[in-house]
Amino acid sequence: MNNETSGKETASAPLCSPKLPVEKVQRIAKNDPEYMDTSDDAFVATAFATEFFVQVLTHESLHRQQQQQQQQVPPLPDELTLSYDDISAAIVHSSDGHLQFLNDVIPTTKNLRLLVEENRVRYTTSVMPPNEVYSAYVVNDTAPKPNIVEIDLDNDEDDDEDVTDQE
């Protein structure tokens, strides 16, 4: 038959399979509280769609990174590495906004020092002497722990209360 099929495809032998494991896609879907019974073909389609989504996001991020590196004087490296900032920048600057829905999931990072200087974040550290640290861990679990960084993301500038004062 010249390696041609006679028009019949067997359900057990797909033409191609996704690179992502379908079983993991099923497991993730079944963890959703709104999960409904779904066919195996739908899970395969979801795996293919996820692969395509990851490819688009990676391509956009690499393209954005290459544009930024071309503006710099040093030559481009042979190997490119994507960072979180590259991906979040690609999401923010997506050409037609097709990645904007990811803004809440992958937000841009902000420099803590700049936020403190702008008075948008209160940043305090407290260091305890070693003998108090030991007693705090052994005797009292509710005592303040050493080197605790308190960040108050409250945008109210007129509110001068500290997070520890509210307890």
Curated annotation (Swiss-Prot):
Principal location: nucleus
Native organism taxonomy: Eukaryota, Fungi, Dikarya, Ascomycota, Saccharomycotina
Transcription in keyword set: yes
Natural source organism: Saccharomyces cerevisiae (strain ATCC 204508 / S288c)
Role description: Functions as a component of the ISW2 complex, which acts in remodeling the chromatin by catalyzing an ATP-dependent alteration in the structure of nucleosomal DNA. The ISW2 complex is involved in coordinating transcriptional repression and in inheritance of telomeric silencing. It is involved in repression of MAT a-specific genes, INO1, and early meiotic genes during mitotic growth dependent upon transcription factor UME6 and in a parallel pathway to the RPD3-SIN3 histone deacetylase complex.
Superkingdom, natural source: Eukaryota
GO cellular component: CHRAC; chromosome, telomeric region; nucleus
Gene3D superfamilies attached to this UniProt entry: Histone, subunit A
GO molecular function, one term: protein heterodimerization activity
Something else known: Present with 3390 molecules/cell in log phase SD medium.
Subcellular location: Nucleus
UniProt GO BP: chromatin remodeling; DNA-templated DNA replication; regulation of DNA double-strand break processing; regulation of DNA-templated transcription; subtelomeric heterochromatin formation
In-chain residues carrying the UniProt-annotated modification Phosphoserine: S17
Name of the protein in its database record: Protein DLS1
